[in-house]
């Protein structure tokens, strides 16, 4: 009875291990983006703000802080800007700011906003109660919509050594185009599977 060379069996085992390794690496790469996003939202890492259920901090400090507002677009054919450039409020005080968006394209366009704050360490202490960034927004050609954000700065921010002397926080949004499975021509939040589209597709109307 003939025996298969041990070298061939060894090579097959090595090949199988390598294939499993590379397959696992590809899977981890695809999972990394949503996992990183979840991590940022849970911890405030990278300046990601927090979404909270309670509308009030529970206490308001006798100390003011200024929030500056920034707006950017990335391939979406909109005008997008804050209504106010800055607001000064008490730490722990719930306030509402407004952004405004206008669709400059000749077709309905859906946008999605990403956000962060500077300094990044302030992310876990910048609490949003309501925000247009929680859902996608669709605008008809030429339509303008008011986009409110209700928030407060957590009083615990003064207990962080690196933030105890911070007097200004910048809240920044970047608006991206979104392609829907079915065109929607409404400023109401829409449901359904969506994906971010490229600048070229946005310029062509999706």
Curated annotation (Swiss-Prot):
This is Cytochrome c oxidase assembly protein CtaG. The chain crosses the membrane at residues 13-35. It holds the Pfam family CtaG_Cox11. Keywords: Cell inner membrane, Cell membrane, Copper, Membrane, Signal-anchor, Transmembrane, Transmembrane helix. NCBIfam families: PRK05089.1 (NF003465). Residues 1-12 are cytoplasmic. One of its GO terms (molecular function) is copper ion binding. GO terms for biological process: respiratory chain complex IV assembly. SUPFAM superfamilies: Ctag/Cox11. Exerts its effect at some terminal stage of cytochrome c oxidase synthesis, probably by being involved in the insertion of the copper B into subunit I. Belongs to the COX11/CtaG family.
């Amino acid at each position: 009875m003939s025996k298969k060379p041990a070298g061939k069996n060894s090579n097959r085992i090595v090949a199988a291990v390598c294939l499993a390794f590379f397959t696992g690496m590809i899977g981890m790469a695809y999972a990394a983006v949503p996992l990183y996003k979840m991590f940022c939202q849970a911890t405030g890492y990278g300046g990601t703000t927090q979404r909270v259920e309670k509308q009030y901090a529970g206490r308001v400090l006798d100390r003011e802080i200024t929030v500056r507002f920034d707006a950017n677009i990335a391939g979406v054919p909109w005008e997008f800007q804050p209504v106010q450039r800055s607001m000064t409020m008490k730490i722990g005080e719930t306030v509402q700011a407004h952004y405004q968006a206008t669709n400059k394209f000749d077709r309905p366009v859906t946008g999605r906003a990403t956000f962060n704050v500077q300094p990044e360490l302030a992310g876990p202490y910048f609490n949003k109660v309501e925000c247009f960034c929680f859902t996608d927004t669709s605008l008809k050609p030429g339509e303008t919509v008011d986009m409110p954000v209700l928030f407060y700065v957590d009083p615990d921010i003064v207990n962080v050594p690196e933030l105890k002397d911070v007097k200004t926080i910048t809240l920044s949004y970047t608006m991206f185009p979104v392609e829907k499975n079915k065109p929607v021509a409404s400023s109401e939040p829409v449901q359904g599977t969506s994906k971010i589209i490229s600048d070229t597709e946005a310029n062509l109307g999706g």
